[in-house]
């Protein structure tokens, strides 16, 4: 197997944020706020940025908007950190189109969520990813999040896909440390295994994961960077100490479907307007006090 992406794989580590897509109250993408968030994340030490993933509301952006956000994102980052662009779809041709757009924009890697809703078989998943890999020559990351997609990329399927040299990583958002550990044991020398679950990410790092693609890092980028920088050095005592101080935030960011709570939090922090797109709605009032208390305890709001 070719190693032409070996150097790039070493960049896929540490604290990576699945950044929200800021929107105005009318639902339009708020590009000035997006630029500010990107700058803040980089200043706070985030190692890698993910554009228009699940947290970035990829499902409710039009194809043109999706492409426009990726182009803006890459241009504004301007090489300061790697950019991973969410380009997954449950239609293989659409995923190929979005991945081609990400490559044209200059993104460093494409993040490809498993096709949702139409429930492909394992062979269908293999053929889907194979087609994208062959159609667009750029680093690609598998994304397994069965809680959202209702399909689970089996380890055997990942092992087959690891034969493609541009399939460089997998984001494992199953929330199962055991599942992640099995992946690392079988494939850790071939592809980069990243956590996609804030609550279990540090534990998975102990077993050889290289980093975490995070929702919570939207609001505490410095703390998350500190956690995973320490973990990469093998200093799990420091990592756990910082992690424990922000662990309550992980739960709060999922009191309703993400990115509802994290957008509410960023709005309370003055970082974004109160904008989200249907069918997602603003955080239910019954959770406001709970989330506010958590933000206050973390020193994020007065």
Curated annotation (Swiss-Prot):
The keyword Amino-acid biosynthesis applies. InterPro entries: Aldolase_TIM (IPR013785), DapA (IPR005263), DapA-like (IPR002220), Schiff_base-form_aldolases_AS (IPR020625). Its EC number is 4.3.3.7. The record marks 54, 117 as: Part of a proton relay during catalysis. It is found in: Cytoplasm. It comes from the Bacteria. It catalyses: L-aspartate 4-semialdehyde + pyruvate = (2S,4S)-4-hydroxy-2,3,4,5-tetrahydrodipicolinate + H2O + H(+). One of its GO terms (cellular component) is cytosol. The active site is at residues 143, 171. The keyword Amino-acid biosynthesis applies. Gene3D superfamilies: Aldolase class I. Transmembrane segments: none annotated. Keywords: Amino-acid biosynthesis, Cytoplasm, Diaminopimelate biosynthesis, Lyase, Lysine biosynthesis, Schiff base. It is an enzyme of class 4 (lyase). Pyruvate binds at residues 55, 213. Pfam families: DHDPS (PF00701). GO terms for biological process: diaminopimelate biosynthetic process; lysine biosynthetic process via diaminopimelate. Pathway: Amino-acid biosynthesis; L-lysine biosynthesis via DAP pathway; (S)-tetrahydrodipicolinate from L-aspartate: step 3/4. Its main location: cytoplasm. GO terms for molecular function: 4-hydroxy-tetrahydrodipicolinate synthase activity. Catalyzes the condensation of (S)-aspartate-beta-semialdehyde [(S)-ASA] and pyruvate to 4-hydroxy-tetrahydrodipicolinate (HTPA). Belongs to the DapA family. PANTHER family: 4-HYDROXY-2-OXOGLUTARATE ALDOLASE, MITOCHONDRIAL, DIHYDRODIPICOLINATE SYNTHASE. Homotetramer; dimer of dimers. This is 4-hydroxy-tetrahydrodipicolinate synthase.
